[in-house]
């Protein structure tokens, strides 16, 4: 069982119609990691945090911000397709430290990272699109579908209770397509 928490990056006015404040994605991820840091599922060694991002630049920015927190006994590890095989394999080797893994949607379905108890979902991904007009393949950043959000949530809670923080609102989630086109 996984508890899903919504922590949108925009704060609305009390009437829900006006954006009062907006945080950037890295700040939202840092806040979510700090929130999850104090929580450990009862009787579990699944204490690692898996954060989903749309690309390498976002991962590097978040890695810098999370490393600056200097959380004790923690290592921050990137995971994306262009990493060398040796760097990717670091994610699958448990160390004595708690890990924060920053990944693209490569970690959504194709592999299982051991020790994940928590997920932070930014709600975006690079989605492959082919333009019939220009005959060019593109990778724009788009909101993920409900099915992709469910896949991301399912990365935790496999061996014990888990928590997924989504950096978007319930209303945003409900408005998303069921599946990626």
Residue ranges and their predicted role:
Residues 1-181:
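P-loop NTPase motor module signature
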